[in-house]
Amino acid sequence: MPRKPRFYLPDVPVHVVQRGHSQEAVFYEEADYRAYLDWLEEAAERYDCAVHSYVLMTKHIHILATPSARDGVSRMMQYIGRRYVPYINDTHGSSGTLWEGRYKASLIQEE
């Protein structure tokens, strides 16, 4: 059965959560956080997503972003994942998936 397509709207904020596979760490040292943030900055600029805030925890991440285009958040997260996962696997001698499935995303409504 195919996955449900994600639903985003341009200029509507999105809360993104991505967790480590089997509740494992996704950041091991300071350089890992820096690498992730560098790619987040590149991706946000490339796909025109305004990143309002983020929290990088040892085992998961939170990002609050507003995309200008409908596919901005998806493209941003794909860009980061295609760089960060191989970086972790190469740097720390691991292999396979880093994340627990797809990231979760929720539209943020105004009151």
Ranges and model annotations:
Residues 1-111:
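Short catalytic/metal-binding and nucleic-acid-binding patches
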